[in-house]
């Protein structure tokens, strides 16, 4: 019998122990559950306690009994239980491997709850491939902020499968762009940026204020496959409303410069079809 499994840390896509899931189908790339992530000696590990306010970010897989048996061996000394996992298409119940709090005494807590982001920051990864799908496809605000030099090396139009561009971040003047992992296909601009550009992007996207969160996706651009590209997703998603005109202009300007005419028209039609807030 197959089970849903929530994985984090080195079991995630493109990480060093992902081969243990080689025969398992990925159900959700963007998933989270309540808890704390620690950088333990043998690798990242999850801890649950009553005070947990944060989330652990990972992926959901459908695993058979053989896969679960292999993971039981890999996670010797760990505990296993089912948890509620949040995805863009609803709540799921999945197995997770975790440690007791005492087992992580002295280990560093990964405050973001995201192993991929922790790796990017701790290794000062350079360059970074950044997938922009909203107003960052346009360079007007880059120039105004004096940071356009960070974005002078665009790879160009990129296609992301499994996601759809939506407008779920509600503001007083209208919405802002987001992506939902709902099985669709979307387009954006892939930039090659230096590590030093992150401070600007994190501030603009409101990472500290929990507006958007860093996430990682695989895209196709110029006939090549780019793995673990940085992007930003809305944390508190609401029903879609129309974006304000000034924001829509930025999106359309960037889309017309980089994206396919068919997708650009589709995106315009969608924005124009949304109700005013």
From Swiss-Prot:
GO cellular component: cytosol
Domain of life: Bacteria
Pfam families xrefs: AIG2_2, GGACT
Catalytic residues in the record: 205
Keywords noted in UniProt: Acyltransferase, Transferase
InterPro entries assigned: AIG2-like_dom, GGACT, GGCT-like, GGCT-like_sf
Sequence similarity: Belongs to the gamma-glutamylcyclotransferase family.
Protein name as it appears in the record: Putative gamma-glutamylcyclotransferase YkqA
Lineage, uppermost ranks: Bacteria, Bacillati, Bacillota, Bacilli, Bacillales
């Amino acid at each position: 019998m197959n089970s849903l499994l929530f994985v984090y840390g080195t079991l995630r896509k493109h990480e060093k122990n992902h081969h243990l899931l080689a025969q398992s189908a990925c159900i959700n790339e963007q998933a989270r559950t309540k808890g704390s992530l620690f950088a333990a000696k043998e690798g990242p590990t999850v801890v649950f306690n009553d005070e947990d306010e944060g989330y652990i970010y990972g992926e959901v897989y459908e695993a058979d009994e053989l896969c679960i048996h292999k993971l039981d061996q890999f996670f010797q000394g760990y505990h296993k239980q089912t948890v509620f996992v949040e995805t863009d298409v609803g709540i799921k119940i999945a197995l997770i491997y975790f440690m007791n709090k005492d087992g992580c005494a002295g280990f560093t807590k990964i405050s973001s709850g995201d192993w991929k982001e922790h790796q990017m920051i701790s290794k000062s990864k350079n360059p970074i491939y950044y997938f922009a799908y909203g107003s960052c496809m346009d360079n007007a605000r880059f120039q105004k902020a004096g940071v356009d030099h960070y974005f002078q090396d665009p790879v160009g139009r990129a296609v992301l499968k499994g996601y759809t561009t939506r407008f779920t971040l509600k503001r007083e003047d209208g919405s802002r762009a987001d992506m939902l992992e709902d099985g669709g296909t979307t387009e954006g601009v892939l930039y090659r940026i230096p590590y030093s550009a992150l401070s600007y992007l994190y501030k603009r996207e409101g990472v500290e204020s929990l507006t958007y969160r860093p996430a990682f996706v695989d895209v196709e651009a110029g006939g090549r496959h780019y793995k673990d590209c940085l992007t930003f997703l809305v944390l508190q998603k609401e029903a879609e409303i129309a974006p304000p005109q000034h924001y829509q202009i930025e999106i359309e300007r960037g889309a017309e410069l980089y994206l396919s005419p068919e997708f650009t028209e589709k995106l315009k039609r969608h924005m124009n079809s949304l109700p005013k807030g």
